[in-house]
Amino acid sequence: MADFLARDYRSQGEAAHEMLPTFLIGKILRERIVDSIYWKEQCFGLNACSLVDRAVRLEYIGGQYGNQRPTEFICLLYKLLQIAPEKEIIQQYLSIPEFKYLRALAAFYVRLTWDDVEVHQTLEPLLRDYRKLRIRTNSEIRLTYLDEVVDDLLNAEVVCDISLPPLRSRLQLEDLDLLEPLSSSSDEEDDDEEQISKLESNEGAVDRNI
C-alpha cells in the first residue's frame, strides 16, 4: 500500500501546459524519483507547510547524479508538482530571503507551471539575486549563482535534467502588448529591487498561510 501511494502520479493542481503537473517531469525520471529512498522516507505525506522544512535543509540543486540517482532537490520539486500550492503560497516561498534553495525550488516550479507572462514577471526580479548555490551533476558538486539558475530557467531548454515547457521571450510578449518594455538599466534595477522587497515583505505571512 505504501509503495502504491509513493507511486501515485496524481496532482492536486489543475492542468499545466495541457497535462498533469507531475507529467512535466519525464516518465523515466519520475520512476527514479518514486523509487528513491529520499522520496519514500522524506517526501511521503508532505504538504505545502512541511515541505518548507525539507527545502530549507537542501545543500545543492541538480537533477541526477552518480548512477542516475535523483537529487533531493528534484524529489521536492516533484512533490511540489503533486501538491500544486496556490500561487500566493509560492510567492511566500520566494519571499523568504534567507532560504535560497527554497527560492530556487519555487522559481523552478513557477517556470514549469505558470503562464509566460507570470513567469517573466516573477522570475526577472530574481536575476538580481547573486547568491552562491551548489549544483550537483553526475560527476561533481560545483558552485553556481541563483541569478544564473534563473537565467537558465528563462532561456535554456533543459535545466536539472528536466525539459522545460516552451516559453515565449520577453520581446515576443512585448510585441503582443502582454508585457511592458523594460525601462533603462538603472530604473530596471530599481524596479527589480522593489519587486524583491515586495516578495520579502510577505515573509511574515508564511506561518499564517502555509
UniProtKB/Swiss-Prot annotation:
Start and end residues of each stretch annotated as Disordered: 181-210
Keywords: mRNA processing, mRNA splicing, Nucleus, Ribonucleoprotein, Spliceosome
Pfam families: PRP38
One Gene Ontology cellular component: nucleus
Region forming the signal peptide: none
Biased composition (Basic and acidic residues): 195-210
Source taxon at top rank: Eukaryota
Subcellular location per the Swiss-Prot or TrEMBL entry: Nucleus
GO biological process, one term: mRNA cis splicing, via spliceosome
InterPro entries noted in UniProt: PRP38
Subunit structure, as described in the record: Component of the 25S U4/U6.U5 tri-snRNP particle, a subcomplex of the spliceosome.
Function, in words: Required for pre-mRNA splicing and maintenance of stable U6 small nuclear RNA levels. Implicated in the formation of stable and biologically active snRNP structures. As part of the U4/U6.U5 tri-snRNP particle, dispensible for spliceosome assembly, but required for conformational changes, which result in U4 snRNA release and the subsequent catalytic activation of the spliceosome.
Similarity comment: Belongs to the PRP38 family.
Protein name: Pre-mRNA-splicing factor 38
Lineage of the organism: Eukaryota, Fungi, Dikarya, Ascomycota, Taphrinomycotina
